[in-house]
Amino acid sequence: MKENYNYPLDLSWSTTEMTEVLSFFNQVEKFYESKVEKELFLESYAAFKKVVPSKMQEKQLGRDFEQSSGYSLYRALKEVEASGKRFVSADKA
């Protein structure tokens, strides 16, 4: 994890939309740093997708976020979706 990184945001988004996107980024961070509740993570992703419906824009934001933070949105989402557990984390230990 990198310290003091910036979130990739679109300045044309409303405050509410920015909040939804930041909430999802925070869920991704939590996935890597501790653990997330699967249901809350997926709800946050659904809200994120309402703001960012385009796959292309989602991939670009994901790349920008990973470059900045070291955390992969794609990997986090896939692992959470595939998990049968209520709580999921990147740490397999």
Swiss-Prot record:
InterPro entries: BH2638-like_sf, UPF0223. Gene3D superfamilies: BH2638-like (1.10.220.80). It comes from Lactococcus lactis subsp. cremoris (strain MG1363). Belongs to the UPF0223 family. The lineage of its organism: Bacteria, Bacillati, Bacillota, Bacilli, Lactobacillales. Pfam families: UPF0223 (PF05256). This is UPF0223 protein llmg_0515.
